[in-house]
Amino acid sequence: MSNIIARFHKIQVQDGVKVWYREAGAAGNPTILLLHGFPTSSNMFRNLIPLLAGQFHIIAPDLPGFGFTETPENYKFSFDSLCESIGYLLDTLSIEKFAMYIFDYGSPVGFRLALKFPSRITGIVTQNGNAYEEGLDDRFWGPLKEYWKSYQSDPVFVKSLIPYLEDPANVICQYHDGVPAIESVDPAAYTLDIALIQRTGQTDIQLRLFFDYQNNIKLYPAFQKFLRDSKIPVLVAWGANDTIFSVAGAEAYRKDVDNLKVVYYDTGHFALETHVVAIAEEIISMFAEN
């Protein structure tokens, strides 16, 4: 019973990052790496972890720049760097084979890991984790696509994006948009996100990652080739009402994955807030060892 309760750790890895992570389940079970997105942390998996820990060994880190992970002063915030830090964590923990649960920013981090360690990936759960241009909903990405045509410190774009990043309402709406009954969403989740993202230096970190996101799109063909070549099983568990990564991004996985299951939920971006039990059941059904 004790194995299903998350244990908390902080460990310094090769690049100087002190990675804070949650761990649960027996180390002898198949490992699933849970990779969160913006603007949250591994806290988004708080309800999923005990549902999976009986069948899996769970590792859920806070990405650099998020949650309680600490970075050195000279850390360069890019998706390449985030991938490198998580790769160091996996090596430090001697984790050789693992499946991934990817969400939002966790998707480009996870797919970079797959390109770096293709033989180590045993499967993917993508919950609103995009790898296709058609999945980029312009209601969210339109302004950022214009920003990418300029330069990172362009004052016009920076001036418009800072209020977006610093307004708590823009965190809350990611939890509420597309959810039929918003009272079903735990307010503690976005309240923690808001508190963490309002810390000193956070706005600059998130601006850098916003600008760098364009480099993820350039890697989409490589991500897709990995899916075709690896033949790994993929579960697409998608909040169908997401206004950041659309259903078109979920459907696009059909082009490159043979061993695929696609499941839609009547909810928004943070599908675990409303459908955690259903998603856990799909993961166990597809990936647990009998």
Curated annotation (Swiss-Prot):
Domain (AB hydrolase-1): residue spans on this chain: 30-274
SUPFAM superfamilies associated with the record: alpha/beta-Hydrolases
GO molecular function, one term: epoxide hydrolase activity
InterPro entries: AB_hydrolase_1, AB_hydrolase_fold, Haloalkane_dehalogenase
Keyword Membrane: no
GO biological process annotation, one example: epoxide metabolic process
Top-rank lineage group of the source organism: Eukaryota
Alphabetically ordered keywords of this record: Hydrolase, Serine esterase
Residue positions of the active site: H269
EC number, as in UniProt: 3.1.-.-
One Pfam family it belongs to: Abhydrolase_1
Family that this chain belongs to: Belongs to the DmpD/TodF/XylF esterase family.
Protein name per Swiss-Prot or TrEMBL: Uncharacterized hydrolase YNR064C
Species this protein is from: Saccharomyces cerevisiae (strain ATCC 204508 / S288c) (Baker's yeast)
Native organism taxonomy: Eukaryota, Fungi, Dikarya, Ascomycota, Saccharomycotina
